[in-house]
Curated annotation (Swiss-Prot):
HAMAP family: PurH (MF_00139). It comes from the Bacteria. This is Bifunctional purine biosynthesis protein PurH. The keyword Hydrolase applies. GO terms for cellular component: cytosol. The lineage of its organism: Bacteria, Pseudomonadati, Pseudomonadota, Gammaproteobacteria, Alteromonadales. GO terms for biological process: 'de novo' IMP biosynthetic process.
């Protein structure tokens, strides 16, 4: 059975007019009758493309300042009519078939993103006729063609030219999926916006804003299927948020290597987000979602060498992230020294690509340079629900911390404290990080007891022959007891940065003073689970 459907009549009504004139001209060249509305119709007419206004076609004018334009039986009957079934009804009601609809919707997201947008502004940018036509056409995809993305104009014209003015069922079905995805995302945005409006306490206002809507709607697009999930018995896929354009593992382009695994993607995200914290040339090496080596240097090669030195054992099979262009010398140092799963950087020089190409299995990613960080939400799934929170973008500078000990940190200690605090933010709690000269000396991650995380950091440093004496220490949360301070002093730590806030803060500070250590409070915690 031939599933091709000829395009003889099309309705074009778009807010974003990118490419619509050229598309209309191509349809006209194929002998297609064009219907249109408002600004789209004027654009076509002004450029010599024959077009029939929908109001003339239906015999009913646009009313209510354009709120009612296409909501008419001649429009929706023409779209929804089943070919070979509804011809008699169409004839009785003077309805002609409409074979193609190209629609994109009022810019609701752009409107509500504007500073000073009112509820009234938002309401006027809720499209009614557009989504209705989109859904009608997509529902009847067996016979009609829907286009919601300008990027599909050329595809449809090419298919018509190759098929005597017709489209195939395969194409119509694919476009219908895109259409339903489009309207689902649109309605989700509207529901999210309205869901943040809660009854106001003021008599003069009907609502005030809440950060979290009553229902949360989001749409993620599948980027790739994965070989398996966290474990080989789990199936998995990678979905991305196309509304966020910050350089990330989601936007990264893979230049070479084996396909990314579930764990590769998760660990690469951890490494990249950590290295973004640094302005100086920096390298972060991650293993099982925890930084095992972090350092800054005069250049990326020095930063990598120092980061690797922290824990060469754990770096084996790790993920390496940089905050600058990967050069040939740094790439050579990596592939000649260690087995690595993934290397990611904002950009990769051609010489570096050539070096890494010798190791065909190494996954090399280029993510683009980040100018700023996007304000967004973090998700954590629990059985039967989803936890939403602000992304942890909190960070402190030298002017934000409070020295609580008798001894003041030296300038070099304070610099190391700032470095160490940035790293601790990305270590699984309980997190303890030892550092010296802008290089991690030991990392204690994920222990149920904070004092044991401190002990682990010391053990890691000792195993690699690194000297803890006169290093600084960061703790992602406050110390509940002085035992962590005593353990740090015994290891040779000279200075500690921590949030503070324990009911035993005075005892903790006294312990630091007893050991002649400097201690600063950040007033900010960085739990990471």
């Amino acid at each position: 059975m031939n599933n091709a459907r000829p395009i003889r009549r099309a309705l074009l009504s778009v807010s974003d007019k990118t490419g619509i004139l050229e598309f209309a001209q191509a349809l006209h060249a194929q002998g297609v009758e064009l219907l249109s509305t408002g600004g789209t119709a004027r654009l076509l007419a002004d450029n010599g493309v024959p077009v029939i206004e929908v109001s003339d076609y239906t015999g009913h004018p646009e009313i209510m300042d354009g709120r009612v334009k296409t909501l008419h039986p001649k429009v929706h009957g023409g779209i929804l009519a089943r070919r070979g079934i509804d011809e008699l009804v169409m004839e009785q009601n003077n309805i002609n078939p409409i074979d193609l609809v190209a629609v994109n919707l009022y810019p609701f997201a752009e409107t509500v993103a504007k500073e000073g947008c009112t509820l009234a502004d938002a309401v006027e940018n809720i499209d009614i006729g557009g989504p209705t036509m989109v859904r009608s056409t997509a529902k009847n995809h067996k016979d009609t063609t829907i286009i919601v993305n300008a990027s599909d104009y050329g595809r449809v014209i090419a298919e018509m030219q190759a098929n005597e003015g017709s489209t195939t069922l395969e194409t119509r079905f694919d476009l219908a999926i895109a259409a339903f995805e489009h309207t689902a995302a649109y309605d989700g945005m509207i529901a999210n916006y309205f869901g943040t409006k809660v009854p106001a306490h003021s008599k003069d206002e009907c609502h005030e804003d809440s950060k979290f809507p009553r229902t949360y709607n989001t749409q993620l697009v599948k980027k790739q299927d994965l070989r398996y999930g966290e474990n080989s018995h789990q199936t998995a896929a990678f979905y991305v948020d196309t509304n966020l354009d910050e350089a990330s593992v989601a936007t990264a382009v893979q230049l070479q290597g084996k396909a990314l695994s579930y764990n590769n993607i998760a660990d690469t995200d951890s490494a990249l987000e950590c290295v973004k914290e640094f302005d100086e040339p920096a390298c972060v090496i991650v293993k099982h979602a925890n930084p095992c080596g972090v350092a800054i240097g005069d250049n990326l090669l020095e930063a990598y060498n120092r980061a690797f030195q922290t824990d060469p054992t754990s770096a084996f099979g790790g993920i390496i992230a940089f905050n600058g262009e990967l050069d040939a010398a740094t790439a050579a140092a990596i592939v000649e020294r260690q087995f690595v799963e993934v290397i990611i950087a904002p950009s990769v020089s051609q010489a570096a690509r050539d070096v890494v190409a010798a190791k065909a299995n190494v996954r090399l990613l280029e993510c683009g340079q980040w100018a700023s960080k996007t304000t967004s939400l973090d998700y954590k799934r629990v059985n039967g629900g989803l936890l939403l929170q602000d992304r942890d973008q909190g960070m402190v500078g030298i002017d934000d911390v409070k020295v609580v000990s008798k001894r003041q940190p030296t300038a070099s200690e304070m610099k190391d404290l700032m470095f160490c605090w940035k790293v601790a933010k990305f270590v699984k709690s309980n997190a303890i990080v030892y550092a010296k000269n802008s290089m991690t000396i030991g990392v204690g991650a994920g222990q149920m007891s904070r004092v044991y995380s401190a002990k682990v950091a010391g053990i890691k440093a000792a195993d690699e022959g690194l000297v803890v004496q006169d290093s600084v220490m960061a703790s992602d949360a406050f110390f509940p007891f002085r035992d962590g301070i005593d353990a740090a002093a015994e290891a040779g730590i000279s200075c500690i940065i921590q949030p503070g806030g324990s009911i035993r803060d005075e005892e903790i500070i006294n312990a630091a003073d007893e050991h002649g250590m400097a201690m600063v409070f950040t007033g900010m915690r960085h739990f990471r689970h």
